[in-house]
């Protein structure tokens, strides 16, 4: 794996607050939390953006958000899943370095031991954004109840009616729409 959302550069657009746009080849560096553009000469340039700039890649909108979390960092590039008045859903694409799992039994060393290099693994998750606060979406229903952000009875009703799966984006979007209106 790589520290990039997609190792290849994709056609994208940078949309500035004043309405100006820049189209070109763009990719996201998830570790440095910045965007990179590839010039016509093949030169790769990292670009710093603020929370007023939107980046569109493959139909998805990304934006820098001030998460202000000790656990997830001050800022993060989030993909906008749905933005509504009372509650929004964002995806936080992340990668982490993970060492390969080694077998329990090892052969005697020959001096030519091959150590496996760590690899970049997807480690992304969703955030609810409520009143400018970012709450990580848990993958377990009980943990969602413990967050105490939704009325428990309404949540139970929604869960029964909609087969809530906290790992599926389309189900989370339905949940956000439901609680935005109720």
Predicted features by range, described:
Residues 182:
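Short arginine-rich
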Residues 1-3:
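N-terminal secretory-pathway/extracellular module detecting exported/lumenal segments
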